[in-house]
Amino acid sequence: MNFIEIACLCAAIFINIALIQHTIAVFREKRNKLLELFNNRPILPARKIRKKRKKRQFWIRPGRTPLWWENLKNNIAVIEEWQENFRMSQPTFKKLCEELRPYLTKKETNMRKPLDVETQIAITLYYLADEGRYRKVANAFGVARCTVSRTVRRVCKAISTKLGPFYIRLPSTPQQVEELVSGYLRFHGFPQCIGAVDGTHVQIIQPNENYTDYLNRKGKYSINVQGLCDYKYCFTDVVVKWPGAVHDARKKCVRI
C-alpha cells in the first residue's frame, strides 16, 4: 500500500468520524430540546391530584363473583385456559403454589375468610399476563381492586425474595461454568459463552421526582432491565435498577 492509498484511507476514516460526531450532536440537540420541554411542563404534587377517597360501601361490589375462577380451579372450564390466562400449565401452577404456601398463607379472622394461596397466585399471574388492569382482574376473581393491588405486591415480593435466589443464580463452580460453555457450543454454536445478555424497557407511571431520568429515547417513562440467559433459555441473572434514560451502552454487566 503506497502513500496515496494510506492518505485516502485516513481521509475516509476522518470523514466517517466527522459524520458520526455530527449525528451524535444532532441527536443530543433533539434530546435536550425534548428534556427542556418536559422540564418546563408543570407537574402537580401527587397529594393535589389525588382524588378524595370515597367511603367504602361494600367489601365486594354486588355482581362480582369468582365463578370463572372457581370453574377453572374445579376443572369445569377448558384445560387450555390455564396456559392462556396464567402462561403456565396446571401442574406448574400447583407446584408454584406449594413452594409459596409457607409465605402466603393468611390467618383467618372474625371479619371474613382470607384469600387462599391458589387465588392469590392466580390473581397475580392473571394480572401479569395481561395489560395490568385492576378492574379486569377484580371482575374475573370477584374481589375488590384494592385487594388485587395488595395481592399482586405481596405475591411478587414473595417470589422475588424467596424463590428468586434459588432459581435465578449465576454459576458458582467450575463444573457449572463448563456445563454452560459446552451447552452453548453444542446447541447454539457459540464457543466460550456462558450467557446471552440483553435489556428491555418496562413502562412505568411518571414519577413525581427526577422524572426526566426515567424518560427513554421513545419518550416514555420506563425502567431499563438487564437479563442474562443460559443456553436453555433460563434466566441466570436479572438486574432491575437502571432508569429508562440510561443508554444500553452505559450499563455495566453487573455481577457478570
Summary of predicted features, one role per range:
Residues S89, I123, V137:
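Short alpha-helical segments in extracytoplasmic peptidoglycan/chitin-binding modules
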Residues V117-D130:
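Short, amphipathic alpha-helical "recognition" segments used to contact nucleic acids or chromatin
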Residues K107-L115:
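Short, surface-exposed loop/turn segments at secondary-structure junctions
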Residues K30, W68, V78, W82, ...:
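Alpha-helical interaction elements in eukaryotic regulators
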Residues R101, L128-R133:
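Short connector loops/turns at beta-strand edges and beta->alpha or beta->beta junctions
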Residues N2-E5, R133-I256:
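Short, well-ordered secondary-structure "scaffold" segments embedded in the functional core
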Residues M1-K107, T161-G164:
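Charged, often Cys/His-bearing segments associated with DNA-binding zinc-finger transcription factors
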